[in-house]
Amino acid sequence: QNDIPQDLTVEKLVMFGRMPYSSLLKKKTEEDEEAVTWALSCTNLLDKRENDLSALSGGERQRVWIAMALAQKSEILCLDEPTTYLDIYYQLELLELVKALNDKHHLTIVMVLHDINQAIRYSDHVILMKNGQIVAEGLPREVITKEVIKDVYGVNAVFHEDEQLGLYMMPLSI
């Protein structure tokens, strides 16, 4: 989990996302304010903008870091294991948020996930790697197979299809 800067509010941290557009002599602009408000709105943090980071839950803090990245207004959002250290509720909340950012704002999301079921459920395209080499790439349900899981992770697994859950994997043995 990210270290928490002391004495910093949610809004101030998110404003750091605007640093690429500022200089030493330039004060924050209306465009900066709008970008920060948009990022806070996208991450459901408008009501927490004045809160100290230390007063937030782990899931809320993770959303603040995402809001900071969103404030940059780039077309691509890169996330490295965004659900690590979060409990199940906040994992799902965060993944639903990321999916909404992709669906509603057409952001390209590049995300590292180690939970195969999360990758199946929340990814449009996956790349599986082993020792720095791409082993499989494509649509999750086409490339995440028991053979690929055995090759990449050394794990025997079965896959099930459920009407409510969709496709999911159950690891069996090593």
Language-model segments: which ranges?
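A short, surface-exposed alpha-helical micro-motif characterized by mixed small hydrophobic
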Residues: A119-R121
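Helical segment within the ABC ATPase nucleotide-binding domain
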Residues: L92-H105
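Conserved ABC ATPase signature
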Residues: K27, D52-L56, E60
